[in-house]
Amino acid sequence: MKALHFGAGNIGRGFIGKLLADAGIQLTFADVNQVVLDALNARHSYQVHVVGENEQVDTVSGVNAVSSIGDDVVDLIAHVDLITTAVGPVVLERIAPAIAKGLVKRKAQGVDAPLNIIACENMVRGTTQLKGHVMNALADGDKAWVEQHVGFVDSAVDRIVPPSASATNDPLEVTVETFSEWIVDKTQFKGALPNIPGMELTDNLMAFVERKLFTLNTGHAITAYLGKLAGHQTIRDAILDESIRAVVKGAMEESGAVLIKRYGFDADKHAAYIQKILGRFENPYLKDDVERVGRQPLRKLSAGDRLIKPLLGTLEYGLPHVNLVKGIAAAMHFRSDEDPQAQELAALITEKGPQAALAQISGLDANSDVVAEAVNAYNATK
């Protein structure tokens, strides 16, 4: 089996690329970073530091790399069996034209073997969004062939891969936590379902997408925002602060009540899942910076993301949300010289006041009780 993976960054190398290579799949990375491409093609291998209670160093070998903006990547798309991505949500649109060209070439060469594409991004139904961009780049005459032969498979991914300062200045070395989860929608594949260790197949993907978004992402963000306010440097420092931990755990329990109501998750198993995530935040080997985790607060405060979406669920089912509201208030306080969205957020609050600013960012009704609760919490944490 041959696979092409867009994005040779830390998540690409440390998570998805590693799983594919470990499964014996012939893997080629596509990226724009020439230093990384040259290193991969010189060595065809790299090291992954898996950190947790039992630290280990794994070597990923037998890999190649091509530029994601040249003809080589188009040629590869015409022949591979699987395409995966870990490029970040905003970059999906940029790689779509190359994928479209490759699919046209595949059709022209008479390659009718099924191809599956899986976007492994921190977003809801990212592959469906990528499909839209690819279809926009195709001529009408090619769309029916693509619909018939190409599966666009949505997935949920979960592994903390912080930027790590390599002691050896090796551009390929990467550090990851022990935990990883890659869940894919088995109803969207074309052809036979792949058997890749570490890839879980489900016919109920949205339950797992929201479980991860409402628990890991919600908890991670609130830990970062409260941690920043309290002067902590890392996620570990923040979650070991009992006052922060109580709010984070409470928020995950509130969002969890929504999941249990919506999808029928087992309450005891979900409580154990929350405990596991709190343990991941405590990992002493991950130097996970609160500023990194908190960045892009406008996106994280938008209607479909990790703070407002679970809050909307609590409103839908008439459930408590006091800790989620505290997290939202802390997000509104996020300031960072490195992050344009943090600066935009600050300017918006200065210009419009917290009530109108939150309503604009989140889509919540400015006159609703929950916005008033958030504004009160915001003012209380000044």
UniProtKB/Swiss-Prot annotation:
Its EC number is 1.1.1.17. Belongs to the mannitol dehydrogenase family. PANTHER family: ALTRONATE OXIDOREDUCTASE-RELATED (PTHR30524:SF0), MANNITOL-1-PHOSPHATE 5-DEHYDROGENASE (PTHR30524). InterPro entries: 6-PGluconate_DH-like_C_sf, 6PGD_dom2, Mannitol_1_phos_5_DH, Mannitol_DH, Mannitol_DH_C, Mannitol_DH_CS, Mannitol_DH_N, NAD(P)-bd_dom_sf. This is Mannitol-1-phosphate 5-dehydrogenase. NAD(+) binds at residues 3-14. The keyword Cell cycle does not apply. GO terms for molecular function: mannitol-1-phosphate 5-dehydrogenase activity. GO terms for cellular component: cytosol. GO terms for biological process: mannitol catabolic process. Keywords: NAD, Oxidoreductase. NCBIfam families: PRK02318.1-2, PRK02318.1-3, PRK02318.1-4, PRK02318.2-2, PRK02318.2-5. It comes from the Bacteria. It catalyses: D-mannitol 1-phosphate + NAD(+) = beta-D-fructose 6-phosphate + NADH + H(+).
